[in-house]
Amino acid sequence: MTNIRKSHPLLKIINNSFIDLPAPSNISSWWNFGSLLGICLALQILTGIFLAMHYTSDTATAFNSVTHICRDVNYGWVLRYLHANGASMFFICLYLHVGRGLYYGSYMYKETWNMGVILLFAVMATAFMGYVLPWGQMSFWGATVITNLLSAIPYIGTDLVEWIWGGFSVDKATLT
């Protein structure tokens, strides 16, 4: 009698991907951070979609929408905390994934490493935009501090900061 995980069409795919995965026996736990990144990213997307359903860009009602999510939405507080802590876990896994690549010398594969660096910058830019764009529900101080780092660029830094802010200071919601 054959095992159902090897004969059923859907279970066979899962079996070949996870259980009978052709991987070397000396693989360490450092190699699972890519999978954890995928899980964290899926969690971020799902919780972000559900939180966006209650989004309001008006600075006067932004705090009320957050309290509405936490108090009135079923398990809204769980969504909010999963989204916040999921972002932290995502970046922890990301940095450990990069650290594993450094430790095992993956930087020797130049094309692969350069693509990873591009993806790292894209992820950081996306996270920054996700933090800065909904002005009404984020920290003006955080946006000011993060974007002020650009002022350290010689000659064009201050002009670049003013261009990103659209003026001399961060103000009002940008998403409507």
Curated annotation (Swiss-Prot):
Chief location: mitochondrion
Known cofactor(s): heme b
Residues noted as binding heme b b562 in the record, renumbered to the chain: 83
Keyword Membrane: yes
Cofactor binding note of this UniProt entry: Binds 2 heme b groups non-covalently.
Function: Component of the ubiquinol-cytochrome c reductase complex (complex III or cytochrome b-c1 complex) that is part of the mitochondrial respiratory chain. The b-c1 complex mediates electron transfer from ubiquinol to cytochrome c. Contributes to the generation of a proton gradient across the mitochondrial membrane that is then used for ATP synthesis.
The protein's name in its UniProt record: Cytochrome b
Organism: Lasionycteris noctivagans (Silver-haired bat)
